A protein has these predicted regions:
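Surface-exposed polar/charged interaction patches
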Residues: 13-20, 60, 64-71
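N-terminal acidic leader/helix
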Residues: 3-29
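Acidic, low-complexity, intrinsically disordered interaction modules
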Residues: 23-66
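Short acidic DE-rich linear segments
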Residues: 75-78
């Protein structure tokens, strides 16, 4: 997936409620945003962050993916 994912698409899909699964050497976790929650938040590495941090988190994901440190895939609804 890394070849067809860009920063803007990553931010857009997270804001739209899609879940991104990140696989590392030590396991996997999901990233998602809840822009309409109170307070609006993004969930990353098992922690809740203010939605204002979404751009920085998305950039970090892209950087780590391009360095080959993580693999990503969108979680599909069954």
């Amino acid at each position: 997936m890394s070849d067809d994912l860009n920063l803007e698409e990553l931010k857009r899909r997270l804001k739209e409620g899609d879940y991104l699964e990140i696989s590392t050497g030590g396991g996997a976790y999901e990233v998602w945003a809840e822009p309409y929650a109170t307070p609006p938040a993004v969930y990353f590495e098992g922690e809740q962050h203010p939605i204002a941090e979404l751009d920085g988190i998305a950039q970090r994901i892209m950087d780590e993916m391009h360095r080959g440190e993580i693999r990503c895939r969108w979680v599909e609804d069954d």
